[in-house]
């Protein structure tokens, strides 16, 4: 194998060779090609970045808010100019098709755009008269050094709802990107620096357990934002909180889609295919379970099977490909094991994605399991792959009861034209993000990404006004100004 480039950490505005004695291959999941190697950095390197970030915070937090916003606007413009390059990097190291990658880049740009509104977002409140000659004002201040732990499945969108907002509000930031998708972050760092961000304000340390524990334990770091699996999210929340940090942990999901008898059949099938199998099912807003009313079930499922069997599978850089690979071979094997567990427990496999006919890469085709029940492993666990479970129900009330049994409560969708049914769904379903006649109800940057139950640990969600509250603390000033001597 030819020499493979070893990535460096980004600390204090410089690319710094890691002191790690271990590197991991970064693999194109569609081909198996080794793209580069990423360091599994040491705790000492994270601690070094924390000291640098703390020093940078002292100056950056004093920069006028409009000036900070201009850096974010410049960053946004550079992202727009490099949109295609960024999308291709995502497809290369993550595997999702190029159209989906372009969509992710656009969502990342929108996150930066929202953060660039810092002058408005930072505004406090005031009351001119709370008592005789007494007024009060509420001011926002940045919390300090913030740590972020990002996943592989959205290597641009998720980090871009973390560090741009935190930095725009006056904080400094240390990011641990996924070691599976580091190349995109390398490009983002380059563009953020070009936009005029001072050295030390944004730092990137690649790694695994030691870096995560450093973020959670280092006293310099005041807040931690995490996106990833439920077990790791629980650990992050408990450990970070025990060390007196603010923590938001966005974790697993098992999103249910309800299809009622009056649903538009063609539109619903199109949306469910996209929601279940887009991004290879590796997203926390994927449709994992469909509960379909008996009156439309046969017709809907026949159309769904046909559509799933016609999905084009392959390298996301190739024209017309809809479904790319899962991220690694171990994910592929894990997914196949879940499918076989479903069969053992009595589910009916009506579309089998275990064999795709592709000789290289880590592919699982669209898979549909019917006759699923809520005691089955495939219904309970987050599979994080292009596997869809189907449950037939008698009515909306039963569909909601099924969904609400899940420990997860990230998103849920309904397909119907019945306003009463929509209202019932909205009021009774346990989930933080709801979709009506659409398959992926991920909100825009100015609304919170608001999972419930085991899908989220913390108080303040990512994005929206919650993110402003998360990355700032408040100072209320009460002042007396006597008007004595100015009487008319």
UniProtKB/Swiss-Prot annotation:
It comes from the Bacteria. Gene3D superfamilies: Aldehyde Dehydrogenase, Chain A, domain 1, Aldehyde Dehydrogenase, Chain A, domain 2. The active site is at residue 284. Pathway: Polyol metabolism; myo-inositol degradation into acetyl-CoA; acetyl-CoA from myo-inositol: step 7/7. The keyword Magnesium does not apply. Homotetramer. This is Malonate-semialdehyde dehydrogenase. It comes from Listeria monocytogenes serotype 4b (strain CLIP80459). The lineage of its organism: Bacteria, Bacillati, Bacillota, Bacilli, Bacillales.
């Amino acid at each position: 194998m030819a020499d493979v480039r070893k990535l460096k950490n980004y600390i204090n505005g410089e690319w710094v060779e890691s002191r790690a004695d271990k590197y991991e291959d970064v693999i194109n999941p569609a081909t198996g090609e080794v793209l580069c190697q990423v360091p599994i950095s040491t705790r000492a390197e994270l601690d070094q970045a924390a000291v640098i970030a703390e020093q940078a915070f002292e100056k950056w937090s004093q920069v006028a808010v409009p000036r900070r916003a201009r850096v974010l606007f410049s960053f946004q413009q550079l992202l727009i100019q490099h949109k295609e390059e960024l999308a291709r990097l995502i497809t290369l190291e993550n595997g999702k098709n190029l159209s989906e990658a372009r969509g992710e880049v656009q969502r990342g740009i929108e996150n930066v755009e929202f953060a660039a509104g810092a002058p408005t977002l930072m505004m406090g409140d005031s009351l001119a008269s709370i008592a005789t000659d007494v007024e009060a004002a509420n001011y926002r201040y940045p919390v300090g050094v913030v740590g972020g732990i990002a996943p592989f499945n959205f290597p641009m969108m998720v980090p871009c709802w973390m560090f741009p907002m935190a930095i725009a509000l006056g904080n400094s930031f240390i990011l641990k990107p996924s070691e599976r998708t580091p190349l995109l972050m390398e490009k983002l760092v380059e563009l953020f620096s070009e936009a005029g961000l001072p050295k030390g304000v944004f730092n990137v340390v690649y790694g695994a357990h030691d870096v995560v524990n450093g973020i959670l334990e280092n006293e310099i770091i005041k807040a931690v934002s995490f996106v990833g699996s439920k077990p790791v999210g629980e650990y992050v929340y408990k450990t970070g909180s025990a060390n007196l940090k603010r923590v938001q942990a966005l974790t697993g999901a098992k999103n249910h889609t309800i299809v009622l008898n009056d649903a538009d059949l063609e539109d619903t099938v199109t949306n469910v295919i996209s929601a279940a199998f887009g991004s290879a099912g590796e997203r926390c807003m994927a449709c994992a379970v469909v509960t379909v009313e008996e009156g439309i079930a046969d017709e809907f499922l026949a159309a769904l099977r046909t559509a799933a069997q016609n999905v084009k599978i392959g390298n996301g850089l190739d024209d017309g490909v809809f479904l790319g690979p899962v991220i690694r071979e171990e994910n592929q094997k894990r997914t196949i094991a879940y499918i076989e567990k479903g069969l053992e427990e009595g589910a009916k496999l009506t579309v089998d994605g275990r064999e795709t006919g592709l000789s290289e890469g880590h592919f699982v085709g669209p898979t549909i399991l019917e006759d699923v029940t809520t005691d089955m492993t495939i219904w309970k666990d987050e599979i994080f792959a292009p596997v869809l479970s189907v449950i037939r129900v008698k009515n909306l009330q039963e569909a909601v009861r099924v969904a609400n049994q899940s420990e997860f409560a990230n998103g849920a969708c309904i397909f119907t034209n019945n306003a009463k049914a929509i209202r019932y769904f909205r009021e009774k379903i346990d989930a933080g993000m709801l979709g009506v006649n659409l398959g992926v109800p991920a909100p825009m940057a100015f609304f919170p990404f608001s999972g419930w139950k085991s899908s989220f640990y913390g108080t303040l969600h990512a994005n929206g006004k919650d993110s402003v509250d998360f990355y700032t603390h408040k100072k209320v000033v009460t002042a007396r100004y006597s008007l004595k001597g100015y009487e008319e």
